[in-house]
UniProtKB/Swiss-Prot annotation:
Main location group: secreted
InterPro entries, A to Z: Amidase/PGRP_sf, Amidase_domain, Peptidoglycan_recognition, PGRP, PGRP_domain_met/bac
Keywords, in A-Z order: Antibiotic, Antimicrobial, Disulfide bond, Immunity, Innate immunity, Secreted, Signal
PANTHER family per the UniProt record, alphabetical: PEPTIDOGLYCAN RECOGNITION PROTEIN, PEPTIDOGLYCAN RECOGNITION PROTEIN 1
Stored Pfam families: Amidase_2
Name of the protein: Peptidoglycan recognition protein 1
Domain annotation N-acetylmuramoyl-L-alanine amidase: ranges: 40-168
Organism placement in taxonomy: Eukaryota, Metazoa, Chordata, Craniata, Vertebrata
Covalent S-S links between cysteines: 18-142, 34-79, 55-61
Length: 183
């Protein structure tokens, strides 16, 4: 059922998109209560990890995305899952708030001017699956081609902009090698 959304990319603001994004409806997200938009194109991308459980199949990643959203909405009282996108080790990108809604991933200074991409899992002591890294890089490339990200966008690690261990030592080392990474 993962491909059932393919005829409806316009519903995600992804008409003629090069991105493979699992829509909220596919992972059975709760309705968002967020409405504050992001000014496009966005200059910054903040990479984090959830520091929670890993997922490696569409079913387990959909469940993990729901778990993250439930915690952030019900326990923390946020209007939705904090991130614009979530990356699973199944190699899929899961729509959080998407390209157009401000996230709650990095605090009041960075949220209004960045896209938050989180890798589901804890990457302190292990690297993400290659297919997860490819999915994230493809999402960034598509963000530029679709006009959501500036062509000269900058990638930051969560720890570069906030006092945290996120995105974990192993993932942080990897993103530092990405072309758009800036400390």
């Amino acid at each position: 059922m993962l491909f059932a959304w393919a005829p409806f990319p316009a519903l995600l603001g992804l008409a003629d998109s090069c991105c493979f994004v699992v829509p909220r409806s596919e992972w059975k997200a709760l309705p968002s209560e967020c409405s504050k938009g992001l000014k496009k194109p966005v200059r910054y991308v903040v990479i984090s990890h959830t520091a929670g459980s890993f997922c490696s199949s569409p079913d387990s990643c959909e469940q993990q995305a729901r778990n993250v959203q439930l915690y952030q909405m019900k326990q923390l009282g946020w209007c939705d899952v904090a991130y614009n996108f979530l990356i699973g080790e199944d190699g899929h990108v899961y729509e959080g708030r998407g390209w157009t809604i401000k996230g709650d991933h990095t605090g009041p200074i960075w949220n209004p001017m960045s896209i938050g991409i989180t890798f589901m899992g804890d990457y302190s002591h292990r690297v993400p699956a290659k297919r997860a890294l490819r999915a994230a890089l493809n999402l960034l490339k598509c963000g530029v081609s679709e006009g959501f990200l500036r062509s000269n966008y900058e990638v930051k690690g969560h720890r570069d902009v906030q006092s945290t261990l996120s995105p974990g030592d192993q993932l942080y080392e990897i993103i530092q090698s990405w072309d758009h990474y800036r400390e």
